[in-house]
Amino acid sequence: RRQRQMCIRDRFVGSGGDRGYEILNGFNQAFVDTVRSNGGNNGYRHLVIAGYAADITKTCDPRFKMPEDIDNHCILSVHYYTPKTFCRASIQNYWGNKSEQEWMEHQINNLRTTFIDNGIPVIITEYGAKGSDEASRVFFCEMLTKLCRDNYISTFLWDDGSEFDRTSFTWHTPELINALKRATSGNSYVPEKPENIDEQTREAKPTSETSEHDNEPAEPEPTEEHTTTEETADIPPETFQSLTG
């Protein structure tokens, strides 16, 4: 296994940008082709396709291509951990000012227009928040879930034990589960922002220069010089087999 890992690292080191998209598109196509060629239910089972770094901005880039497959049997998977300082690092304790809400709305709308409106289902397979302010965490999760519900996107709350006690089988924050139930009820309402959020949160929001997934610089917007066509990386079968074992 170690030799195989070294092979992957050496073969694709430094391959971001256009080449990074070509590699991922090629892997995703090879995955679909491999499953479909194995008979039985594999011919039509639904397959989940990982976006670029699970990042919404990078995945909505036109260089990312969904694999060719039978109609309506591939589902896109991305994550939502924006901003990283609130969702992953526990540096920002409060969330919910106007600019932060607008950025969340922008990202979900981006998924809607790029994929949902073109017949491609989307799942946010991970989301969550680490900020210490309980009301902000609940508001973040409720607003994201409600936006996704209204735009036909399914969501999975990622829990590492901080939300649900697997010994007592109880929620640490009961209001969170109540908020998620409200958000998925199908009722028309606007999640209520906690008081004083505008004063307690920073005004900065992610921009097109900020990666949603890890706060590293995002890929530049495609230009005529590097916009790809429908072609993807050609990965020989023997290479794919060596990577997958």
Task: Show which residues each predicted segment covers.
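Extended hydrophobic/Leu-rich segments
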Residues: 10, 176, 180, 189, ...
